[in-house]
Amino acid sequence: MVKLLLKDLGEKMILEGAIIYSNLLVLLALGLTLTYITTNVPNFAQGSYAIVGSYVALTLLKLFGICPYLSLPVLFVVGAIVGLITYLALKPLIKRNASVEILMIATLAIDLILLGVIGAYSEILSQIVGSTQAKFVFANLDFSLFGFKGILFVSTFVVILLLIGLYLLLYKTKFGIALRASMENPSLAQTMGIDVEKTRLFSWILSGALAGVAGGLLPFMQEIVPATGDLIIISIFAASIVGGLRHISGALIGGYIIGISESLITYYLASAFGTGFLVYGKVISLIIMIATLLIAPYGITGVDWKKLKRLLSTS
């Protein structure tokens, strides 16, 4: 009886963690998808954006005693600034119609710069507060509600708020209409007098802002080190690719598929074959991503479901 209760409790915690992780992946994958649609840049620095947010949240906590949840608006702004700086750095390459490979290498360089800056900053912060800040978690600062972690409710609320805000922006404002037009056909949008440059700038600012917020929430579920961004970028890309890099909704679909699959499959493999399998969680994401590329190269949102249904009905 006790073993059964412990098993049920363990599965509840894993499912709870899977939903939290998926919520954060949605925020990060959405930013990656936005910048890819508008500028055709596969941003390998997206994970490091989040870790910048994590360390800013840590700074506000250690120096000013501000709860990480209350620092989310600040992280939104800081992330937006990082996204803006990245776009300004990449803009000359984009203007010259640089290849995807060159843009990818440029974002990798930016990621390495951010990694170095974050590592150096963690050492400076350690000297200021008098204890090592190279790695940290916020789990002990979280609250609980109805037996669930507070981060579950906060991350879910942030995702819902984001989706409502994006819907209102894209479908209820003139700028949103211009943004959608720029995403679907930049050349035609420019011909029609739409300021494509402004929409590109906005997408990078929003991408950084979302990553900053995700970074503030990430320490509530896992330990953060300066290189954490380079670990989670695998799952971020997997989420965007599985959902479909050509549609914003793909980030939502892919985020939950990758987040839940990675968490649950890793848990059950570890339960069956030992805890050594816990370190291979990212391999699950890669396998799902590769399988998706083989079956549906443009992701789930890129599948012509009506055509597929007709083919299945005639066979």
Curated annotation (Swiss-Prot):
InterPro entries in the cross-refs: ABC_transp_permease, BCAA_transport_permease
Disulphide bridges: none
Biological process annotations from GO: amino acid transport; transmembrane transport
KW Transmembrane helix (keyword) present: yes
GO cellular component: plasma membrane
Subcellular location(s) per record: Cell membrane
Membrane-topology annotation of the record: Multi-pass membrane protein
GO MF annotations in UniProt: transmembrane transporter activity
Main subcellular location of this protein, as a coarse class: membrane
Alphabetical UniProt keywords: Amino-acid transport, Cell membrane, Membrane, Transmembrane, Transmembrane helix, Transport
Membrane-spanning intervals of the chain: 14-34, 49-69, 70-90, 100-120, 150-170, 201-221, 224-244, 250-270, 283-303
Family as reported in the entry's similarity comment: Belongs to the binding-protein-dependent transport system permease family. LivHM subfamily.
UniProt function note: Part of the binding-protein-dependent transport system for branched-chain amino acids. Probably responsible for the translocation of the substrates across the membrane.
Protein name: Probable branched-chain amino acid transport permease protein LivH
Upper lineage: Archaea, Methanobacteriati, Methanobacteriota, Methanomada group, Methanococci
